[in-house]
Amino acid sequence: MSKEKIALAYSGGLDTSVMIKWLKDKYDAEIVAVTGNLGQQKEIENLESKAYSTGASAFRFVDLRKTFVEEYIWRALKAGALYEDVYPLATALGRPLLAKALVDVALEENCTMLAHGCTGKGNDQVRFEVTFASLAPHLKILAPLREWEFTSREAEIAYALEHNIPVSATKKSPYSIDENIWGISIECGVLEDPMVTPPEDAYQITTSPENAPDTPASVEIEFVKGIPVALDGERMSGLDMIQKLNDIGAANGIGRLDMIENRVVGIKSREIYEAPAATILHFAHRELERLTLEKTVFQYKKNISQDYANIIYNGTWFSPMRKALDAFVDETQKPVTGLVRLKLYKGGISLLGRNSPNSLYNEELATYTEADTFNHKAAAGFIHLYGLGMKTFSQVNPGL
């Protein structure tokens, strides 16, 4: 009788490396290790040999980068999705796509179980399992970190050393790092104390702003209907643009975020993020929206941006609500076409200029020179009607 198969979302990090051995022994099952490429740099080398040497019976590497950029990142950018006005949702955006890829492989390999390496008090367990339930409700879900005997990363490291499992984490530097092309999240270790300044060795790609070049860098980004299409006059794929902006931004200290955030499970956590390209593109996109969106649309979209960010963060990407919000966002982005020029300097971004064929800025109406075409006399009647409700209230309710 053949053994059951477990499809494991495998990153090659400490948790999932230990997990292959642990799942194989506990369930007497074959482990299909599945890794999705979301543009991470450090984690993909030698993953296949590492998975097999740790006990996996099969390994699948799925290149998700193009899909990630075009169907996930650009949707979030157009929506202006920044969780609690700060986090560009790099890890959160990647989870539903990774979960979908795991389900796809599991069905192809006739697996009966899905396993992930998410902690029992984190957000990712929600994101993975809600996606699993949406796409493959008949498959059993395993969450080893909620049930195994290890109570700390140090215990996992000891287990790995005992069973000759190669891991990069050490007891001296136990950071937990998740990386994709949209950003990097760093947690654990000394970072758990919110009063501790993040050590420089916690940062993976960005130069310290103090050590960034003394000469500012400038970039010009072209958007078409809310989507970036060209950098400094050169048309390129979304993947190439994000990679280039990550390099430019990181060199200039852009995109370091230190945040206390509200997790799905009800606790606050301290998170360190690096997201150079995301920080630059969100800044540029927002400035172009200021130029091209009608006032009420611009102001109302702020609410939608938060709703969209919450959907991503809370793991409900495959919900009807997200699809409904996409329809609204796509409508708002029709005029968001133009150029934005930015200065990057020692961790800061400043605006150098912007223009659009759909600009709602009318210099003849805005100017205070003789070229002014604004009808000043019309203001008196407008103000009378605009303030009539408050005037009436005060007359009826004096002193209130």
Swiss-Prot record:
Fetch the InterPro entries from UniProt: Arginosuc_syn_C, Arginosuc_syn_N, Arginosuc_synth, Arginosuc_synth_CS, Arginosuc_synth_type_1_subfam, AS_cat/multimer_dom_body, Rossmann-like_a/b/a_fold
Among PROSITE patterns, the record links this protein to: ARGININOSUCCIN_SYN_1, ARGININOSUCCIN_SYN_2
* E.C. numbers: 6.3.4.5
List the catalytic activities from the record: L-citrulline + L-aspartate + ATP = 2-(N(omega)-L-arginino)succinate + AMP + diphosphate + H(+)
Q: Which residues bind L-aspartate?
A: 119, 123-124
Q: Where can this protein be found?
A: Cytoplasm
What's an example GO BP annotation here? argininosuccinate metabolic process
Q: Which GO terms describe its molecular function?
A: argininosuccinate synthase activity; ATP binding
Which residues bind L-citrulline per the record?
87, 123, 127, 176, 185, 261, 273
Output the Gene Ontology cellular-component terms.
cytoplasm
UniProt-annotated binding residues for ATP: 9-17, 117
| Pathway(s) | Amino-acid biosynthesis; L-arginine biosynthesis; L-arginine from L-ornithine and carbamoyl phosphate: step 2/3
UniProt keyword terms in alphabetical order = Amino-acid biosynthesis, Arginine biosynthesis, ATP-binding, Cytoplasm, Ligase, Nucleotide-binding
- Provide the assembly information: Homotetramer.
NCBIfam families given in the database record = argG, PRK00509.1
Q: Which family does it belong to?
A: Belongs to the argininosuccinate synthase family. Type 1 subfamily.
Tell me the protein's name: Argininosuccinate synthase
- Native organism is Chlorobium limicola (strain DSM 245 / NBRC 103803 / 6330)
